[in-house]
């Protein structure tokens, strides 16, 4: 058959149309119930460390950049990052780099409007603090600490804990927990960021301590005009995540997968055999920027797990990284 330019043009047109239709079909809603597969433990703490935990992760230049907290063999907390790696199977051999100053329970993202990397954390000079950098791979290339939030909360043994930061087109939002059954929110105009959210916050969710414990994370759901929040809960069979959704970051949050038997992620649906706990971690994002965007067609959760037979001092429990992949 002789292929004329007209036929070729029509073929290319149809191919493009099919690709467009296929792309539209690929837009996924969040599932009504979740089922995952899990890796085993992906890395062992290096000598002198008892635990690797509280992970934050971005993909930059095709490589994972992971920061986290460490507990040493005396139960003291510090901070670290992994050397960049391309595939989760490479995490075990990636370097584990201690930070000179602690940035415990970190949140890492690229703030696009100012072309700067942000590392937000707790237990710094203020309730929450942040540092900036032009190179997120360098564990000790961060600026001096700056105030991110200076407020306090009541009815909490820990005080403010486990922040996350996310932005829309006009505002930046700070969400955090208190190990007390409450989730808190503060905001500022995006033009003022990076900066201090001040001293005021509002309670946006309230429940039992067990149901709203810590490790809150908030994400933009790609293509859905929706936001996803996950919060770590304490269950009869270990730590698990509950999920909530909202139509705007300043809006009301509605529980989505909220029970231990049907969680966002937990022993009931993780597929993990090496851990009962699915604890403090971070969904893998589409891009590293402040929108914290995740692809509902390809959800993965970097989490901390541990040997269920381990017991004793919480700060010495052998937490290690693992990854869940959503079954679709």
UniProtKB/Swiss-Prot annotation:
The keyword Glycoprotein applies. Its EC number is 3.2.1.55. Pfam families: Glyco_hydro_62 (PF03664). It catalyses: Hydrolysis of terminal non-reducing alpha-L-arabinofuranoside residues in alpha-L-arabinosides. Keywords: Carbohydrate metabolism, Glycoprotein, Glycosidase, Hydrolase, Polysaccharide degradation, Secreted, Signal, Xylan degradation. Glycans are attached at residue 309. The keyword Secreted applies. One of its GO terms (molecular function) is alpha-L-arabinofuranosidase activity. It is found in: Secreted. GO terms for cellular component: extracellular region. Residues 1-26 form the signal peptide. One of its GO terms (biological process) is xylan catabolic process. Its main location: secreted. Alpha-L-arabinofuranosidase involved in the hydrolysis of xylan, a major structural heterogeneous polysaccharide found in plant biomass representing the second most abundant polysaccharide in the biosphere, after cellulose. Releases L-arabinose from arabinoxylan. Belongs to the glycosyl hydrolase 62 family. This is Probable alpha-L-arabinofuranosidase axhA. The gene is axhA.
């Amino acid at each position: 058959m002789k292929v004329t330019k007209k036929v070729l043009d029509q073929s290319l047109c149809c191919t493009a149309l099919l690709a467009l239709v296929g792309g539209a079909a690929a837009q996924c809603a969040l599932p009504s119930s979740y089922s995952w597969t899990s890796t085993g433990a992906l890395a062992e703490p290096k000598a002198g460390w008892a635990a690797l935990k509280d992970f934050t992760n971005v993909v930059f230049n095709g490589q994972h950049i992971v920061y986290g907290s460490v507990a040493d063999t005396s139960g003291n907390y510090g901070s670290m990052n992994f050397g960049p790696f391309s595939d989760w199977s490479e995490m075990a051999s990636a370097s584990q780099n201690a930070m000179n100053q602690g940035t415990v329970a970190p949140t890492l993202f690229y703030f696009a409007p100012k072309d700067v990397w942000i590392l937000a954390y707790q237990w710094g000079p203020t309730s929450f603090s942040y540092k900036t950098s032009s190179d997120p791979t360098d564990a000790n290339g961060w600026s001096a600490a700056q105030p991110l939030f200076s407020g306090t909360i009541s009815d909490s043994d820990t005080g403010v804990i486990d922040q996350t930061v996310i932005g829309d087109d006009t505002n930046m939002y700070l969400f955090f927990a208190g190990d007390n059954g409450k989730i808190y929110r503060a905001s500022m105009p995006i033009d003022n960021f990076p900066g201090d959210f001040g001293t005021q916050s509002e309670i946006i969710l309230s429940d039992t301590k067990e149901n709203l414990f810590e490790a809150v994370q908030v994400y933009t759901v790609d293509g859905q005009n929706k936001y996803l929040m996950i919060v770590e809960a304490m269950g009869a069979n270990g730590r698990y995540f509950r999920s909530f959704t909202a139509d705007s970051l300043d809006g009301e949050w509605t529980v989505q997968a909220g029970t231990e038997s049907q969680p966002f992620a937990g022993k009931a649906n993780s597929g993990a055999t090496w851990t009962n706990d699915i604890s403090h971690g971070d969904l893998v994002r589409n891009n590293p920027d402040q929108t914290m965007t995740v692809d509902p067609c390809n959800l993965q959760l970097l989490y901390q797990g541990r040997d269920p037979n381990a017991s004793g001092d919480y700060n010495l429990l052998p937490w290690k990284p693992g990854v869940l992949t959503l079954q679709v």
